[in-house]
Amino acid sequence: MDDPSIASGFQQGTGRTTGANGTQIQREGLDGLLRQYPIQCIGTSLLVALLTTIIIYYSSSSSFPSATIKKTPPIPEINPLGGIFYPSKTKAAITAYLTNARGLVTDFFRQNPGKLAAQLHTQIGTIIVLASSTAEEIAHDERFHLRKQTAKTFNAHLPGFEVFRDDYNNHLMKNVVTKYFNKQLTKVTGILAHEMDLALGELFTTAKEGQQWTEIPLHATALQIVARLSGRVFLGEDLGRDPEWLRITAGYAGVVTMAFADLSKWPAWLRSTANRFLPRCKASREYMDGVRRKLRPVIAQRRKERRTSSREYREYNDAIEWFELESNGNAYDPEIVQLSLSLAAIHTAGDLLAQTLTEVATHCEIIEPLKEEMRGILAKGGWQKSSLDKMILLDSVIKESQRRKPLATLSMGRIAVTDAKLSDGTVVPKDSTVSIDAGLMWDPSIYAQPDEWDPYRFVRQRKGSLEKQRLAELTTTAPEHLAFGHGMHACPGRFFAANEVKIAMIKILLGYDIKFADGVEPKVMVHGITLDPDRRVRLSIWRREDGHGGF
């Protein structure tokens, strides 16, 4: 996954804001320090020591990234900071980022059309934001490194966040996805359809007597569905359906990004300590311990079988086996790679499924056309990947839902591994965090009425040139649709994620009526460039008597 998301760690979108919580916490930390040591009771030397401590505190604080991030004067600032002598200006800059990052970036590049880069100060540091027009320029540029950016952003050196490390494990994972996993797509459509039936039987409880509609937590259920489907392919029937494994993987996917957000409110030099006691950080470590408890006996047994009798060794067709084969005897962490694989799948596909269901339930008029397309194609071709490929309206609905709310308003997060000169002469300094403005996804010159959800938008685009037809497909990446990233680090698992979401949507819409309760208007929770779903939203479901309509 090109963590535009996980990957960026920061993201934003349209909707209600959550507020500048990080700034509030930093202020409370200082207020507490002053309350603890009343000024009138402090001698001169102690007062000097206290003031020195305050300066160090703020200089190291994530509220003042300019004190820890090397400035690059030739690159303009979107939200200039005030430094330690003008804290109110810095507070205003960070608050502006937390509540309106997308607007800040859009306004800057609109007002400065000749600029390719600008500095955006966030609560955890400075990002050099590159204009959308540079997406092709750096798409295959090896001077910009994906995993180093992810490791830096997500504190990968700390326990609980090991899945984000830039090491052999993650290089191995990408190789497995491209070499083994994507080749399974044509073979697993029917398997996933059956698994979805089992998952819905457990997660979409039937209405109680005298009650027509049942409510379910939308986002949490979407994560559980994707965990179930992914686990079936990654680990086979037994472990992939194990309730404890599903609880661990879905739980980790749900908590780790929030743990990162909690940790980012602390100064970098205190994060190692904070990681020990922050509740969500502790939960991340506990989930990781659970992964090791579940997988170690399985992996040990398989390795023993392979060593003792190659004749009797049963070949497995799952991710555990693929990692063993691809590692070719080199040391790696099998528990970490499995959790990384699950996290990438659940985080990306789970969010996309939840957002697509949100849009469809909000615009119920699209449900019947979708069901008509689904029934017609399945009646002719059955549960084959080719059938999914023919569902053009469903593909458009999912892509449009993703366009409206991707995981981030910046994409293609990278670290510059050397000083890198752009085509306009701008030099991006070594070790800078870089991301691309994904604003073309809401550009009215590209998408008519971009703030509106148009389920037929990409259906119409398929009637254009061959290039427009290609760009209309859900899994195609381009500068005007960066939700899956772009270039050599584009999300390698996007093809599987697309199939998972399509199968889930088919089974849900053919088997259930869905709606939101009267007055419910799902909001997007904005925190900097992070765009999160409203996790409190509940979806109303009603299982129809005709079940899945024969499918």
Swiss-Prot record:
Protein name in the entry: Cytochrome P450 monooxygenase sdnQ
Residues given in the record as heme binding sites: 491
Subcellular location: Membrane
Compositional bias segments (type: Polar residues): 8-23
Keyword Transmembrane on entry: yes
GO biological process: one example: secondary metabolic process
Annotated TM spans: 41-57
One Pfam short name: p450
Signal peptide (from-to): none
Listed SUPFAM superfamilies: Cytochrome P450
Main enzyme class: oxidoreductase
EC code: 1.-.-.-
Span list, region Disordered: 1-23
Family: Belongs to the cytochrome P450 family.
Role played: Cytochrome P450 monooxygenase; part of the gene cluster that mediates the biosynthesis of sordarin and hypoxysordarin, glycoside antibiotics with a unique tetracyclic diterpene aglycone structure. First, the geranylgeranyl diphosphate synthase sdnC constructs GGDP from farnesyl diphosphate and isopentenyl diphosphate. The diterpene cyclase sdnA then catalyzes the cyclization of GGDP to afford cycloaraneosene.
InterPro entries given in the database record: Cyt_P450 (IPR001128), Cyt_P450_CS (IPR017972), Cyt_P450_E_grp-IV (IPR002403), Cyt_P450_sf (IPR036396)
KW Iron (keyword) present: yes
Pathway recorded for this protein: Antibiotic biosynthesis
